[in-house]
């Protein structure tokens, strides 16, 4: 092709600007004609076939002519300024894109007659390929002076880059190498002219396209790995394609890494896309429940070649506040498959933060009100919240790569271990100015309604107690003790705090334990709510003996006080606290509990047992709690109990088991029954106790509660191994189902045969079902509820609520007045009958409420 020898600007003004727009129109018209006529193409219709082939041939020639124009510009010695040839790149890119789109859609355009024109379509594609390659060579020669602010030149370069970006989306599935080279050119030109075009580039479009291509190539890689895993024979062609695709993954990831590094300040609106990229990749990769099943070798290959590039990307984004906001958004609502990757991401952030400046750590580790509608929670709160969502991964459990230690092989660890180890490591590097945030986050998590989250926080807190100073541990124990004393009644937060107190107490230095004893003296009954939660094994021998003596003395005295008074139900709550403290003594005092103290406890327990009857235990929650505390106390002293008392206990429990009682009551019965395995029952009462024992075990083994079932199997095994009355063991197995259940337990085989894949699918379904009710609850709402240990559930307003409260307040006042009168003098004969009548009315109301519920 011949072009006159003139400078670029003159060529643009006299030729390109005049001819190229007409060329584009001509090409578009030919493309329209092709698409319209292609419907009638057939091997019989030679006229249409000839027409289409002529059009395609003309297009090939036109592309060749354009290539000649581009080559002419490249061949000149003149420096290339984009504004001087602005018609050429835009026209050429339009034609190239149109060509590639047509080639991509050729199967649907030409339907079953593609073979009639396939040779020309291939030629057309090759010409477009050559034209783009030549154009990129030309564009690489373009000079843009960073000191000259030429808006037209800047705009032209931005248009060129985004036009190439559009072409990328077309050719991504057509030619991987060409696709990668086009991306390489886009990144290169963006960085080359960065200082001039950085404010004009549509960074979000570039990042989004890159992330889409990363995900597409990654999914292709996984599909190939899955096919090779499922296939018995190793196909070298498949493996080469896998390696090629993996290489493409790495290229795209490195391109993203490079681009993000240079243009980070402009990526505010791309942070959500980058966050989703990380989550989507890890959701499809083992050990995610939603991962593609691939071999260990392929996992390691993908991780080593591709996943490693995500780590420096997170390092780059760590200091970028918009990324923090996306990751720690209080309203972040992720689907089930992305919750586990979010947890992994937060752990990665924890690992990287210690190397960051204090200012960055502070931003990540503190709450922030970003706007009226947007709140950023702290990293630690986010870790606990995210961890709580991984119920399926925790229950399987999934395993992750463990930490390497000197002289030991690396072992896989559970998600719980993974998070716990990294959390504790993070705590060691926590900046002192952020300790208040650490304390608040740990306490908030300990008070969580989710048991495993609370346990994780306790483990981290115990690590802090050991890692920190003795004074810090003592301070924390004192705070927890005050929190426990401030709880007005039973709630899950109180249970969590009591477990934490028991564990932390072991880490206290003896001098601080002595201070604790002085501050919360066991000589005072008001402190027994604390001592019921403390293991006396945590104390050194001298302090243990002292506190055991004091708790036992005060506890038995309080029991006698209750026995000597009116013995009202209202006083049972404090009595139950006393019994719980005495039980703690029995369970952990060891040799410090001498014979005299044992006798004193047995005496009051026997007297208290005498006041129990079936109706009270069946109907009254406080009596049920008393009953469930007396049973383990009786079991502890089973060898020294009066046989008549044992008979009474067994008879009462046999009757109660036929009623609907809470699980904790039946578990207490179970503990007592299993303790009878240590006892030789006197012949005089064997005929009355042994049948009841077999009946109790039969009823408990048939229970459908999984928790009770497990404990019953353990208790029955313990009883059967220790009892001298082997003859009743077969009598406990009342059905074939029960026998099979016990045999499976003894042989440690599951009740249900389940493949690993089926187990994963079941856990995924369960996770979706269990999480659904909480999907719309924000972190802020969870935080508010968990910081209030008094409330068992969020308050819900009902019609007439205030009237109900007023009526109950009146009832409570009347009961208090009656109690006061009883303390002043004897009750009239009619009072007992009237109270029975009131009790019946109360029971009727309770039944009515249950039917409404």
Curated annotation (Swiss-Prot):
Pfam family, one: DUF4487
Biological process annotations from GO: chromosome segregation; interstrand cross-link repair; mitotic cell cycle; regulation of protein kinase activity
Mutagenesis or variant effect for residue 744 to A: Does not affect binding to PPP1CC. Rescues the mitotic defects seen in FIRRM-depleted cells
Subcellular location: Chromosome, Centromere, Kinetochore; Nucleus; Chromosome, Centromere; Midbody
Alphabetical list of InterPro entries matching this protein: DUF4487 (IPR027902)
Matches recorded under PANTHER family: CHROMOSOME 1 OPEN READING FRAME 112, FIGNL1-INTERACTING REGULATOR OF RECOMBINATION AND MITOSIS
Biological function: Regulates PLK1 kinase activity at kinetochores and promotes faithful chromosome segregation in prometaphase by bridging kinase and phosphatase activities. Phosphorylation of FIRRM by PLK1 negatively regulates its interaction with the phosphatase, PPP1CC, thus creating a negative feedback loop for maintaining proper PLK1 kinase activity during mitosis. In complex with FIGL1 may regulate homologous recombination.
Protein name, per record: FIGNL1-interacting regulator of recombination and mitosis
Species: Homo sapiens (Human)
């Amino acid at each position: 092709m011949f072009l006159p020898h003139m400078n670029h600007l003159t060529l643009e003004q006299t030729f390109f600007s005049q001819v190229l727009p007409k060329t584009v129109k001509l090409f578009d018209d030919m493309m329209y004609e092709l698409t319209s006529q292609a419907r009638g193409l057939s091997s019989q219709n030679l006229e249409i076939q000839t027409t289409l082939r002529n059009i395609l041939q003309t297009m090939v020639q036109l592309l060749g002519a354009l290539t000649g124009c581009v080559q002419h510009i490249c061949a000149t010695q003149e420096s290339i300024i984009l504004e001087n040839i602005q018609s050429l790149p835009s026209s050429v890119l339009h034609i190239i894109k149109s060509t590639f789109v047509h080639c991509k859609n050729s199967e649907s355009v030409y339907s079953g007659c593609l073979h009639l024109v396939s040779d020309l379509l291939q030629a057309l594609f090759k010409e477009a390929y050559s034209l783009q390659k030549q154009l990129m060579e030309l564009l690489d020669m373009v000079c843009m002076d960073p000191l000259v602010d030429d808006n037209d030149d800047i705009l032209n370069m931005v248009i060129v880059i985004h036009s190439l970006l559009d072409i990328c989306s077309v050719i991504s599935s057509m030619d991987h190498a060409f696709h990668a080279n086009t991306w390489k050119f886009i990144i290169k030109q963006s960085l080359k002219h960065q200082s001039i075009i950085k404010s004009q580039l549509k960074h979000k479009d570039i990042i989004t396209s890159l992330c889409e291509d990363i995900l597409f190539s990654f999914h292709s890689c996984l599909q190939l790995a899955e096919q090779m895993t499922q296939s018995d024979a190793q196909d070298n062609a498949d493996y080469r394609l896998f390696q090629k695709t993996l290489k493409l993954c790495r290229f795209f990831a490195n391109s993203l890494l490079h681009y993000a590094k240079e243009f980070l300040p402009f990526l505010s609106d791309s942070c959500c896309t980058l966050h989703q990229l990380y989550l989507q990749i890890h959701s499809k990769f083992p050990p995610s429940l939603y991962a593609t099943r691939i071999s260990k070798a392929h996992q390691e290959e993908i991780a080593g070649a591709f996943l490693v590039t995500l780590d420096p990307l997170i390092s780059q984004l760590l200091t970028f506040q918009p990324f923090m906001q996306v990751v720690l958004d209080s309203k972040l609502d992720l689907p089930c498959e992305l919750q586990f990757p979010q947890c992994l991401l937060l752990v990665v952030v924890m690992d990287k933060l210690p190397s960051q400046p204090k200012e960055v750590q502070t931003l990540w580790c503190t709450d922030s009100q970003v706007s009226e509608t947007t709140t950023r929670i702290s990293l630690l709160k986010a870790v606990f919240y995210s961890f709580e969502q991984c119920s399926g991964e925790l229950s399987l459990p999934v395993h992750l790569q463990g930490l390497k230690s000197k002289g030991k092989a690396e072992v896989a660890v559970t998600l719980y271990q993974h998070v716990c180890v990294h959390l504790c490591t993070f705590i060691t590097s926590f900046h002192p100015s952020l300790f208040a945030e650490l304390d608040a986050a740990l306490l908030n998590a300990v008070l969580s309604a989710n048991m495993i989250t609370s346990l994780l926080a306790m483990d981290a807190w115990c690590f802090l107690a050991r890692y920190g100073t003795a004074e810090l541990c003592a301070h924390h124990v004192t705070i927890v003790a005050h929190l426990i004393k401030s709880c007005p009644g039973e709630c899950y937060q109180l249970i969590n705090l009591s477990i934490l107190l028991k564990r932390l107490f072991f880490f206290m230095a003896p001098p601080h334990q002595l201070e604790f004893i002085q501050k919360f003296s066991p000589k005072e009954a008001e402190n027994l709510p604390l001592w019921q939660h403390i293991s006396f094994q945590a104390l050194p021998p001298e302090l243990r003996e002292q506190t055991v003596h004091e708790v036992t003395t005060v506890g038995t005295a309080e029991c006698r006080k209750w026995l000597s008074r009116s013995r009202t139900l209202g006083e049972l709550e404090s009595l139950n606290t006393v019994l719980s403290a005495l039980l703690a003594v029995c369970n952990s005092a060891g040799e410090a509990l001498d014979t005299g103290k044992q006798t004193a406890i047995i005496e009051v327990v026997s007297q208290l047992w005498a006041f129990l009857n079936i109706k009270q235990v069946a109907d009254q929650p406080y009596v049920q709690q008393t009953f469930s505390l007396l049973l383990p106390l009786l079991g502890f002293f089973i060898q020294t109990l009066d046989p008549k008392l044992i008979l009474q206990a067994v008879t009462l429990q046999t009757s109660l088991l036929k009623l609907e009682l809470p699980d904790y009551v039946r578990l207490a019965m179970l503990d007592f029954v299993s303790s009878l395995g240590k006892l030789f029952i006197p012949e005089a009462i064997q005929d009355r106790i042994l049948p009841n024992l077999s009946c109790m075990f039969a009823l408990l083994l048939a229970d459908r509660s999984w928790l009770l079932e497990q404990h019953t199997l353990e208790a029955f095994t313990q009883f059967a191994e220790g009892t001298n009355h082997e003859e009743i063991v077969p009598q406990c197995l009342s059905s074939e189902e029960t026998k099979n259940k016990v045999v499976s337990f003894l042989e440690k085989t599951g009740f249900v045969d389940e493949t690993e894949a089926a187990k994963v699918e079941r856990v995924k379904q369960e996770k979706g079902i269990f999480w659904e009710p909480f999907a719309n609850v924000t972190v802020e709402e969870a935080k508010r509820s968990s910081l209030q240990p008094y409330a068992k559930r969020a308050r819900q307003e009902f019609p007439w609520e205030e009237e109900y409260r007023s009526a109950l307040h009146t009832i409570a006042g009347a009961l208090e007045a009656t109690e006061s009168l009883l303390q002043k003098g004897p009750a009239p004969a009619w009072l007992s009958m009237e109270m029975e009548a009131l009790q019946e009315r109360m029971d009727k109301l309770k039944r009515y409420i249950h039917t409404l519920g």
